[in-house]
Amino acid sequence: MNLLQLGKLHENVLDAGCEPNRNARYLASLGYKVVGIDISERAISKAIDKTSSEKSNVNFNQRDFSRLNEFKGHFDTVIDIGCFHSILNSDHEPYTASLSHICHSDSSVFLRAFSETNKSRYRRWQGHKRYSLALKRNNVKKLSL
């Protein structure tokens, strides 16, 4: 994971769209406090089953991505690997608005989504621009695409 090598991850991590939960479990094994969320009940059940025999610092929650403001406290790091471009376009703004509630001024949000470089393969490549603009409108200051 390059973010680790670059020292970009900080103590409290949210893994948005955590299936198949490898990142959440790996970061927890390194001592990070991790919350993995997914809208899929099946994905969360599988994640809980996988970690039930492990001693880890990860908590999995089924969660509507537009209701992250229900979390108490803030996250230092948010990792979104495939969540944003998997939700409906109409949910992009509520999702990014909810991120602003769980991020503090020094939080970092890392997004892996479709980009201009692969637009011939994917029709929704413009999503990264909407995400970036929505995050900025909602006062999330640090964004890496």
Curated annotation (Swiss-Prot):
Give GO BP annotations, semicolon-separated. Answer: methylation
The leader peptide range reads none
Q: What does this protein do?
A: Probable methyltransferase.
Keyword check for Methyltransferase, yes or no: yes
Similarity annotation? Belongs to the methyltransferase superfamily.
| An MF annotation (GO) of this entry | methyltransferase activity
Q: Which UniProt keywords apply?
A: Methyltransferase, Transferase
PANTHER family from the entry? JUVENILE HORMONE ACID O-METHYLTRANSFERASE, METHYLTRANSFERASE
Supply the name of the protein. Answer: Uncharacterized methyltransferase C750.03c
